């Protein structure tokens, strides 16, 4: 792989703008090379050089007999100055500029200096932020040590004026024995501790006095904390010295250190990549321009803050030492395994298994079609009854499998265009599923469902199994029960971390607005709005099997008032959840756009209810009302999708898209907008009551649901692309991890 591609591949996606523009500099070098070739073709065999032509006017003849040392010392000169903001600025002067490509060389070094200043400034500002964060972490660790001491000595009464005998050295790092956590983190403190027993007595009350100034942060969002916030009650609580609290504090602080170490690694990689890019581009310049300027320029780079600063390396060593000692039981291998990033390895068995299940799914679909044709099931006497009972039961799997396939395609294109979806969704590092894993699960489920359909039909048509009609009817229920059992299985199989993450987010969607709304919450709720028909299928499962209709092989659900009522409610639940999420964000974030977004979902709720009422009653009044509100909801939703969720149709940008696009072909965005509008209009089909003669009504409803799932899959890609570009614009590459302790002076300062 060429360096240019490797350079881009190793970039932190959210920091792309902060990296040196290697491609731009290569383009300038090509211009220099082109100028030289053009000059050679015109018969220019010798180059005339001028020393400081733009500055002193002194000229000097260039001879190839110059020694390499002369060339090294006189090709360029780099000046370092300090700007008004206190950051270093570098300016390169070319001492010998040839007539051929002179302008391009000046542009090259001007661009290189600007890019290097940008990189150096970004690196230094981030290092300063991390040093400040290290001070905060040091205070958190001091509080943790004091908490441990107090928990180990519960009967000890203490105050700031008393001295107690506590072996605090036993809690410190072996390599840093006799030092406080502040010293370990590199913060200068007064040295009043020695290795003697008396000094321990003097240190213990000082360490324990920290507990006077701290409170526990109740950062874990729950309904109770939401109520406390509404009532303007503080979420800080007095410290209770229990082992359960200690475990929670240690777990939270461990996550803080892991994220802090991740920041350090990213910044170290940032420094290395940019330094390497400068070295590579200067070597190319020397080769093309026949100079020897790389060595001098790299000497300047080596002296700059970007490479000379060792704060990051020191912090990394201190974090490793503290983490291993206090969170890994002094087991360095275990500690470093937790700190270092988890790399997901592509496994051949995943590819093989996915291909196997794809083949099985295709084969079973063909077999199902041949079976239906050979047995003339569509023309059989019980065809209509079968479509009203079995079809809704099995269509559930089709909706879920299609949605998973669309999500797998989303992951593929997110990876291709470097959308950092694991960070956006907040997946635990190393546990995110790739598109291969999702395809494996989707086609595995598809194979299972198709096998169930064929078994059901075969048992229905086979005279030998005709007596087992009840068991035949229970086949789809067995499949649903199996899927639910796997989803909630506590054992570490079938991607447990991803399953539990999904279930947790699903619960937060159901419990809206009692939980703070994060992106995974409203993203999943939006997915559920495209699975209304699947939710109605689940309702049919409960009715068909719960009320015992499967024994008579005839559904009485639609004649039930309870079923009809819940037929409304089930369709509204996803939109109601999104509505409540928008209301909570409007109150918390004071973002007016969330109010307009809530209005969109409120309109959709009314439209869905009217459409459902029209599908049941078939009256003209219902039809007109459904027409009006469905049209408003469709127009409003389409506009919101394109303008707000996707960030397109931005007037100042070229072609009315947006300033930055990840997909290089603009036509993709125009096609996506048109397709979104068309598929949104398909939503109106239930109001239009447009039927195809050779399709059963249940089939038509399923086709409309499938089109909505496809629309949602397209929406997913551009929605996350827009979110990623927002993160890039704000250089947001790290998640915020809540701290366990809150100091009283910090609370006073915040207030």
UniProtKB/Swiss-Prot annotation:
Bilayer topology annotation: Multi-pass membrane protein
Tissue: Expressed in root epidermis, leaf hydathodes, trichomes and petioles, stem vascular cylinder, receptacle, stigma apex and pollen grains.
Region forming the signal peptide: none
Domain SPX: residue ranges: 1-299
Stretches assigned to the Extracellular side: 373-392, 456-473, 645-667
Primary site of residence: membrane
Function in brief: May transport inorganic phosphate (Pi).
Protein's name according to its UniProt entry: Phosphate transporter PHO1 homolog 8
Primary gene name: PHO1-H8
């Amino acid at each position: 792989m060429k360096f240019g591609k490797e350079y881009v591949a190793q970039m932190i996606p959210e920091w792309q703008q902060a990296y040196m523009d290697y491609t731009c500099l290569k383009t300038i070098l090509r211009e220099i090379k082109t100028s030289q070739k053009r000059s050679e073709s015109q018969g220019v065999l010798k180059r005339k050089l001028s020393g400081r032509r733009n500055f002193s006017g002194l000229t000097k003849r260039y001879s190839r007999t110059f020694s390499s040392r002369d060339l090294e010392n006189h090709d360029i000169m780099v000046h370092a100055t300090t700007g008004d903001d206190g950051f270093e600025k570098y300016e390169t002067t070319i001492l010998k500029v040839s007539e051929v490509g002179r302008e391009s060389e000046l542009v090259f070094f001007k661009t290189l200096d600007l890019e290097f200043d940008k990189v150096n400034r970004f690196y230094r500002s981030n290092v300063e932020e991390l040093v400040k964060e290290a001070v905060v972490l040091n205070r958190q660790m001091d509080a943790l040590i004091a908490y441990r001491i107090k928990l180990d000595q519960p009967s000890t009464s203490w105050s700031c004026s008393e001295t107690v005998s506590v072996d605090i050295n036993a809690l410190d790092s072996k390599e840093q024995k006799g030092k406080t956590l502040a010293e370990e983190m590199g913060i200068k403190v007064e040295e009043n501790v020695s290795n003697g027993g008396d000094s321990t007595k003097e240190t213990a009350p000082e360490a324990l006095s920290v507990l006077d100034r701290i409170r526990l942060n109740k950062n874990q969002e729950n309904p109770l904390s939401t109520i406390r916030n509404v009532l303007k009650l503080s979420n800080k609580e007095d410290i209770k010295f229990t082992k359960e609290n200690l475990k929670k504090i240690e777990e939270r602080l461990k996550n803080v250190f892991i994220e802090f170490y991740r920041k350090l690694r990213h910044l170290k990689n940032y420094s290395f990549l940019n330094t390497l890019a400068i070295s590579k581009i200067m070597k190319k310049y020397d080769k093309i321009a026949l100079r020897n300027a790389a060595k001098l320029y790299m000497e300047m780079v080596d002296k700059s803050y970007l490479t000379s600063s060792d704060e990051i390396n020191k912090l990394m060593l201190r974090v490793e030492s503290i983490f291993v000692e206090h969170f890994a039981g002094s087991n360095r291998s275990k500690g470093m395994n937790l700190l270092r990033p988890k790399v997901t390895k592509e496994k051949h068995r995943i590819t093989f298994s996915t291909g196997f299940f794809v083949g099985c799914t295709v084969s079973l679909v063909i077999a199902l079609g041949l079976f239906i044709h050979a047995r003339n099931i569509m023309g059989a006497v019980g065809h209509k009854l079968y479509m009203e009972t079995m079809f809704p039961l099995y269509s559930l799997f089709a909706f879920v499998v299609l949605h998973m396939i669309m999500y797998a395609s989303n992951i593929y294109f997110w990876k291709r265009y470097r959308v950092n979806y694991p960070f956006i969704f907040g997946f635990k590092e190393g546990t995110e599923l790739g598109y291969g894993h999702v395809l494996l699960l989707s086609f595995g489920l598809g194979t299972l469902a198709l096998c169930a359909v064929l078994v059901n039909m075969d048992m229905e048509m086979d005279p030998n199994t005709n007596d087992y009609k009840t068991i035949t009817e229970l086949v789809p229920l067995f499949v649903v029960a199996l899927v639910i059992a796997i989803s909630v299985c506590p054992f570490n199989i079938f991607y447990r971390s991803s399953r539990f993450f999904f279930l947790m987010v699903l619960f937060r969607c159901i419990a809206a607005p009692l939980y703070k709304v994060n992106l995974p919450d409203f993203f999943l709720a939006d997915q559920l709005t495209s699975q209304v028909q699947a939710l109605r299928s689940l309702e049919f499962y409960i009715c068909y099997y719960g009320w015992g209709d499967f024994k008579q092989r005839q559904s009485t659900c639609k004649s039930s008032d309870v079923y009809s009522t819940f037929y409304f409610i089930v369709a509204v639940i996803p939109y109601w959840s999104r509505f409540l999420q928008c209301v909570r964000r409007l109150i918390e974030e004071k973002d007016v756009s969330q109010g307009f977004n809530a209005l969109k979902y409120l309109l959709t709720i009314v439209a869905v209810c009217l459409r459902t009422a029209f599908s049941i009653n078939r009256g003209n009044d219902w039809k007109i009302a459904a027409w009006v509100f469905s049209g408003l909801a469709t127009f409003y939703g389409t506009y919101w999708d394109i303008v707000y969720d996707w960030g397109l149709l931005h007037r100042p940008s070229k072609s009315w898209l947006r300033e930055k696009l990840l997909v290089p072909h603009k036509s993709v965005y125009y096609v996506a907008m048109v397709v979104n509008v068309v598929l949104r209009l398909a939503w109106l089909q239930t109001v239009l009551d447009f039927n195809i003669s050779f399709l059963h009504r249940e089939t038509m409803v399923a086709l409309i649901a499938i089109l909505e799932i496809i629309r949602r899959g397209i929406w997913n890609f551009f929605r996350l692309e827009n979110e990623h570009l927002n993160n890039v614009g704000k250089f947001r590459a790290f998640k915020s991890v809540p701290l366990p302790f809150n100091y009283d002076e910090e609370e006073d300062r915040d207030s």
